[in-house]
UniProtKB/Swiss-Prot annotation:
One protein family per Pfam: ADH_N
Other remarks on this protein: The trimeric TOC159/75/34 complex is not involved in chloroplast import of CEQORH.
This protein's name: Chloroplast envelope quinone oxidoreductase homolog
Main subcellular location of this protein, as a coarse class: plastid
Claim: NAD is one of the keywords in the record: yes
Molecular function (Gene Ontology), one example: oxidoreductase activity
Record's subunit section: Homodimer or homotetramer. Transition to monomer upon NADPH binding. Interacts with calmodulin. Interacts with HP30-1, HP30-2 and HP20.
Native source species: Arabidopsis thaliana
Enzyme Commission numbers on file: 1.3.1.-
GO cellular component, one term: chloroplast inner membrane
CDD domains: MDR1 (cd08267)
Family statement: Belongs to the zinc-containing alcohol dehydrogenase family. Quinone oxidoreductase subfamily.
Free-text domain note: A nonterminal hydrophilic domain (59-100) is essential for targeting to the chloroplast. The C-terminal part (101-329) is necessary and sufficient to select for the import site.
Role noted for this protein: NADPH-dependent alpha,beta-unsaturated oxoene reductase reducing the double bond of medium-chain (C9) to long-chain (C18) reactive electrophile species deriving from poly-unsaturated fatty acid peroxides. The best substrates are 13-lipoxygenase-derived gamma-ketols, but is unable to reduce the double bond of short-chain alkenals and alkenones such as acrolein, crotonaldehyde, 3-buten-2-one, 4-hexen-3-one and trans-2-hexenal, or quinones such as duroquinone, decylubiquinone, coenzyme Q0, menadione, menaquinone and phylloquinone.
Amino acid sequence: MAGKLMHALQYNSYGGGAAGLEHVQVPVPTPKSNEVCLKLEATSLNPVDWKIQKGMIRPFLPRKFPCIPATDVAGEVVEVGSGVKNFKAGDKVVAVLSHLGGGGLAEFAVATEKLTVKRPQEVGAAEAAALPVAGLTALQALTNPAGLKLDGTGKKANILVTAASGGVGHYAVQLAKLANAHVTATCGARNIEFVKSLGADEVLDYKTPEGAALKSPSGKKYDAVVHCANGIPFSVFEPNLSENGKVIDITPGPNAMWTYAVKKITMSKKQLVPLLLIPKAENLEFMVNLVKEGKVKTVIDSKHPLSKAEDAWAKSIDGHATGKIIVEP
């Protein structure tokens, strides 16, 4: 597709928010030997996308400008690199793009073969594009630090999910229920019934005294917390944890890293665990199959055309989406 142009959104410096996004015409990317080129059908946004733009993660994920953001995509393979063996033109897929390179807010993008999986016809493009960062974060948190078995054969655990109506949270509730866990969740008052519909056993309004204290209405102590919210210190979680309880922080900041270090040094049984997502194709395929089988559902907050993707960007920054925000070319 050499020489063909496509519509994309990019930013040229740190900061700027939605106003910093610029509509441009740029060349369609050419896949390297280990890459596939996709005609995109859906892209989902994650908070990490605008945090990168803001410069909040600059030491770990420095930008090269101009930058086309977003990493979670679904589409159709239109070209494959010379070394690609498992995909061909016409395949419907879902992929995780590199946070270093991005590329999702465009009509076409290139993805590595090792982070691309086939998408069955039963799973729509938007449903699939929502999965990579949010779904894989929830899966990794619950199966690795929390140690749950999603076939329900493990020991029954008590799990707390904060910000349970958001992207990661709504997957975490559903996955924890597959593991036969007792799930307590927090969210805003308007989303209580929604979070209950996902399977949560107890739902707390985070603005009430009980919700702010994170206390289980049934008095349970949490074996693990999938912490998707911001601004809650470990001291609030600690009295609500079981003897070996863990708080798995999916967006760890400096305070979380300090608490993690202190708890390690003092050999505390109650731990704060910062989560660094390691995307794996087999995990993405697992999540896609759960959606195909109806065991997990993707909840779409809103869909936006690429021509108005800055509205989706602003909505993500606002931080009150229920489920996932999708951009469609």
